[in-house]
């Protein structure tokens, strides 16, 4: 779904715009089935190893992960995009409904950045670790400086309704024109406290099917999931104009849309998966620091 002129202007003025109704259940269903199948496999492995006692096969997608997580935090190991490398995920990265909106901001030639994640945020009461609450940061802080010279567009996409109770994001608008704020490491890469904007945060609630579009300079953080068993499932994907740096050059980006040169578009899932396998092996041999601090 293409964005309206008003929505595009809101993004460029404030560094963020939330648009409901971009994606449909039909867009999500294949990927959710893949993630559910992963949970099936991973839970069975953990049970065979004695790590859990109950598979909770009667629980729905919204809550099952949390029930298993309550027995073992290992349920999520291997769940991220670069680990799964599933065809359904590859197809979603090239989803036309999403790319129509992305094109409204980036133009007709688009690459998918390798900075992309599946996130399963279980209820905070199940684990006291602050690692499940990402601190205030800009996406520019988790990429190399090369990406500062172009617009890197983050698409934050909930797979279930993201509410305050379920731990939706908080963000600070109107920082897009300030640019990169100095970050520091420790407790998760975060904006230096003395560099934090004075503007108050806004809760970024969004329904399944909606997308939050963020500039790489818009500060945001996650908040505690205060529900009993609901998991806040979400994706964060990033796109850049074709040929522009992603800020993580040692991992593979690829062309997802090109009006001028459609032959550039990568449609081969196996090739995409191979690019990731090769890049991860090279990263194992010659580690590169992903964040700029």
Where are the regions a protein language model picked out?
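Short edge-strand/loop segments of extracellular domains
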Residues: 120-123, 172-179, 232, 238-244
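Non-heme Fe(II)/2-oxoglutarate
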Residues: 41-44, 49, 211-213, 217-293
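Short, surface-exposed loop/helix-turn segments at secondary-structure junctions
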Residues: 60-63, 131-138, 186-198, 229, ...
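A short secondary-structure junction signal
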Residues: 124-125, 129-132, 136, 146-147, ...
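Glycine-rich nucleotide phosphate-binding loop and flanking beta-alpha elements
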Residues: 25, 142, 220
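Double-stranded beta-helix
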Residues: 9, 162-221
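Short, conserved beta-strand element in jelly-roll/cupin
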Residues: 137, 141-164, 205-208, 213, ...
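Non-heme Fe(II)-dependent double-stranded beta-helix
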Residues: 1-13, 20-136, 145
């Amino acid at each position: 779904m293409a964005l309206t002129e008003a929505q595009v202007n809101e993004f460029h003025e404030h560094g963020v715009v939330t648009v409901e109704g971009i994606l449909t259940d039909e867009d999500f269903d294949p990927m959710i089935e893949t993630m559910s199948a992963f949970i099936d496999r991973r839970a069975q492995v953990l049970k065979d190893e004695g790590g859990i006692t109950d598979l909770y096969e009667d629980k729905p997608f919204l809550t099952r992960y949390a029930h298993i997580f309550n027995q073992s935090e290992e349920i999520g190991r291997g769940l991220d995009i670069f680990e799964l490398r599933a065809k359904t995920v590859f197809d979603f990265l090239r989803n036309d409904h999403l790319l129509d909106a992305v094109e409204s901001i980036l133009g007709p030639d688009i690459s998918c950045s390798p900075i992309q994640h599946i996130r399963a945020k279980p209820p905070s009461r199940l684990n006291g670790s602050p690692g499940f609450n990402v601190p205030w940061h800009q996406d520019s802080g988790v990429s190399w400086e090369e990406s500062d010279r172009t617009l890197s567009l983050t698409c934050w996409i909930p797979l279930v309704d993201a509410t305050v109770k379920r731990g939706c994001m908080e963000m600070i608008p109107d920082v897009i024109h300030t640019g990169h704020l100095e970050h520091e490491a420790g407790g998760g890469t975060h904006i230096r406290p003395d560099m934090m904007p004075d503007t108050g945060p806004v809760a970024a609630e969004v329904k399944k099917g909606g997308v939050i579009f963020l500039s790489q300079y818009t500060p945001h953080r996650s908040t505690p999931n205060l529900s009993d068993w609901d998991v806040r499932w979400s994706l964060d994907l990033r796109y850049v104009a074709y040929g522009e740096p992603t800020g993580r050059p040692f991992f593979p980006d690829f062309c997802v849309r090109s009006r001028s040169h459609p032959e550039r578009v990568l449609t081969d899932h196996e090739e995409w998966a191979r690019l990731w396998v090769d890049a991860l092996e090279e990263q194992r041999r010659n580690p590169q620091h992903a964040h700029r601090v």
